Structures are given as structure tokens and as C-alpha cells.
Amino acid sequence: MKRPLSALLAMLIPVCAAAKEAPSTVHPWTPPGVSSDLFESHPAFDPRTGDLYFVRSSKEFKGWRILTSHCDGRQWSTPVDTPFAAPGAEADPWFTPDGRSIYFISTRATGRQNSKDLDIWRADRNADGSWQKPVRLPEPVNSGEAEWFPRMAPDGWLYFGSNRAGGLGKNDIWRAKETRPGQWTVENAGPAINTAGDEYEPLPSPDGKRLIVMADGGLYQSHWDGHRWTKKEKLGPEVNVNGSEIGAAFSPSGKSLLFARDTGEPESGEFFVWQPQGAEAWPPMCGQAKTSGAARRK
């Protein structure tokens, strides 16, 4: 039976209005002291101190340096080099959940000269909280090509990106596991994750059941089915606005995702937080943001 046009319109208008009013799940996170007219990306919060570590580079995403900022009770402090900084490119910081170690990539010197490519390094904490001298992970984790974005899953597999030989495409996701002290096994993450194109950055969720992958076109997600990773699927248009989305970090609960996006002039790279399950008190608030919400550039 056909309905009168007026009746159909009466039914559709409230539905359309509700869709327009649906709250956004992605919001800018641009706190004063951290946000600048340069490119901020790859955030990591120190589980022990709450300090923010992140990468700042030129507007063209060159000259990567890891900086750190502390909440002084009023706002995030002016970012400075990390205590373990060295000459060269440094990026992609990631803390172990207990805060005892930090992984990152660097072209710092292993002898008299800087490395010709990016390698994975780890720094461990002393009992007093200070950082020990960083150590370069051995082969076969590092190779003669570039490695980036090292992230440890709860099961002990260290996921990372690399353009080394033997992959399925130009750049692939790999994973490594330390089978005994100093001895590592490395394997490709497989065709569900990698393609003939580019996959750069892997991020296992805190519970190990999801894997966020930065690849051609932005951010993707895969699920662990108990035996293997499912074929990755691209996240929706609210997250992937222009395909420049990179450097993701999960909240401790796994409910929120902080990432960077190239917004163009004048801001360049900025942080955004995706909260598909609703708001939670993360990223950590500082100063006035504790009462007024995360500060945003106007």
C-alpha cells in the first residue's frame, strides 16, 4: 500500500534531523604549550609522570625531534628535548605500560657517524626514575633499511614498520619477539595487514585484540580472531579526512585514539582524539582544561 507523500515526509524529517544532531566522535586536542604552527604528531604519555612525549617537525614533516612537556598545574610547559636526546632524526616514542622503558626510532650515531637509516632504540629507567643510555635493538629487528613506530603488544610481540627486503609491498608491518635474552625472531605480519602498497605504523590495542595500521589513505583497523589478524579495514571518514592521519596512540582503556592530521596552513599538523564509545577523561587535562575541557585553537 502506498503512503501519501506528506506522511512519508513527516516520517523522514525527524530521522534526518536526528542524524544531523548526532555528536561528533572526533575532536581537536590542541592544548596551549603543545600546539604550535609546526607539525605535532606521535604522542605518548609517560605512565609514571604523566609527561607528554611527542614529535615536532617542520610544516613539511621534516626534521623530526622528540620533545617532552610537563603539566605544571596551569598548562603544559614549553616542550624541551628528552633527557636521552642525541643528534639526528628521532621520532615515534612509545612507553611500556609500566613506564620502565621507552622505545623510539633514531638516526643517532652507533659509532663515529650517524646511522644512514632509522633504527629502533630502547631506553630503560633507573630506580630513581632517570633514564639509562639508550640501546639499539639488534639484528634482525633492525636491518640495513629503515624501521619505525615500534609498539609492543601484550603478548610480547614488538610490531614495527620497515621497508626491508622480503615484504609484500613497498613498506610493510613486521613483528619481532625476544625468544631469549638478546635473541629475536622476526616475521612479516602477513597479507591481512600488508599489501603491495605502503603500510607504515602498527598500533596494538592495550588488550591485544585490535591493531590500528597507518597505511595508504590513513588509518585502518584489524581484529585478532584468536588465531590471526583479520583483513584490515579503513576507519570511517570522520577519522580519515584527508589520508594524512598518522601517529596514533590508544588511551589506557583502549576506548580513545589520539592521532595527528595535516590540517594545512596555518596550523600544519595537529592532534585529534577519536572517542567512538563516548567521552572519557583522556587525553589528560591540564590547568584550565580541567574545568573547561581540552583547549582548542580558535
Q: What do these predicted ranges mean?
A:
Residues 19-298:
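Short, conserved micro-motifs composed of acidic
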Residues 1-4:
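Positively charged n-region of N-terminal signal peptides that target proteins for export
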Residues 6-15:
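Bacterial N-terminal signal peptides
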